[in-house]
Amino acid sequence: MASFSILSIFKIGVGPSSSHTIGPMEAGARFCGLLKGILEQVMRIQITLHGSLALTGKGHLSDEAVLIGLHGIYANELELTTKKALLHEALENKVLKLANQHCIHFDYSKDLIFDNKPLARHQNALILKAFNAKNEVLKEETYYSVGGGFVYTEKELDNLSEEGENESVAYDFSSAKELLELCQKHQKNIAEIVRLREDALKNRPDAMMAKIYHAMLECYDNGANSKEKYLPGSLRVTRLAPSIKTRLEKHPTSGKDPLALIDYISLYARAIAEENASGGKVVTAPTNGACAVVPSVLLYAKNHLFENLSQKAINDFLLTSAAIGYLYKKNASLSGAEAGCQAEIGVASSMAAGGLACLCQASTQQVLIASEIAMEHHLGLTCDPVGGLVQIPCIERNVLGAIKAISASKLALEDEYKPKVSLDEVIATMYATGKDMNEKYKETSLGGLAKTLKC
């Protein structure tokens, strides 16, 4: 397998979920690639969503996502007008245009199966099969959407287990301890180490982070200025970001309230999280469900903490955040279906805390402390989306995740702070806690608020 890029912790895609929307879309597009040379023989496609993909798939738009993917389209390429046209053809006219070349009949009620039983390898699995005119299987593949928009086949997972994701990558690290040692050895900060690593892989870290930053800004602008009153779905959740923005423009917060800046953090986080919930274009950070934490903390820093924050400083924030996210992906999980919301909002808060500490000229040790503090106070957080939608409690958790990140960063900068828990230890604890967590609380909508709140 190709060496893993830390930059891929951030992906431009569409809402509402990285594992349940972006992942299935990629699986569908990749399956189209397997049909090259036999496409004209395909008469029918069967899609089976397993586990969490089945249980929350309709609310997370997993069903629509895989259909779009089967047209050969990836999430970063999708336009809203294209999405509407393709889904109308597939769902209303029952025509699926495989790889955007070969039209077949598609019956949603028969060809798309929701199987609540998870497969052994991961809670988010889907099986795609292509049949010929004799109803014989031409091609079959199982895909696992493991969180953050990352998708693997059975063989790819086996290779990961046997070989690891990276072989002899310069400046690579597998733990926070190794990262700290690298920084000390080369007298570099975390962002600089990530630059060196990605340069060795022939990537363009600064150009990529600038692109990611502008996509985050666009997402915020779209959410803050939306004319839609309600988010899609049965809950009819009101979009609050536009009204918060209007209020703050008319009545800016004064110095009388020392916590008034929280209103701006709420605006930034809600705008982005609401845009994600509406199916808009977003950036995984590290997931869609937690996509607002990192950018809202960055906007807080840019608009309220520092004057004239340079693009390099913004890139440093994002590269540092990505390095922290990489540690969680490598040693734990980014999937709410595998480890609960601690693996999404918790990781995002940990990433943002580290990024903010970096901007505040913290030492590498202090950056890692900030990231540890933020995760420590998300341990055990369940993933229980009401109605299978990425709205309640997801949107407000983004707000609180950002506030915790800022608090964690400030605490880590205290000269006398001496941590008892390391980042590596809290990452291991998060993963173990997630594995011990009852399946009802891991993105199934079978427990917690999802069960208590009737919709």
Feature-to-residue mapping (PLM):
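Conserved phosphate/anionic-ligand binding catalytic regions in large, soluble enzymes, centered on
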Residues: 10-28, 278-297, 341-349
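Alpha-helical support elements that line or immediately flank enzyme active sites
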Residues: 19-36, 295-307, 353-361
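Accessory "access/gating" subregions that flank catalytic or transport cores
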Residues: 202-336, 340, 448-455
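Hydrophobic alpha-helical bundle architecture
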Residues: 308, 320, 326-399, 411-420
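C-terminal regulatory domains involved in ligand/effector binding and gene-expression control
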Residues: 72-253
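Short, mixed-charge aromatic SLiMs
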Residues: 44-57, 88-97, 317-330, 372-385, ...
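Extended hydrophobic packing segments that form well-structured cores
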Residues: 420-455
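An N-terminal structural lobe/cap that precedes and organizes the functional/catalytic core
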Residues: 1-12
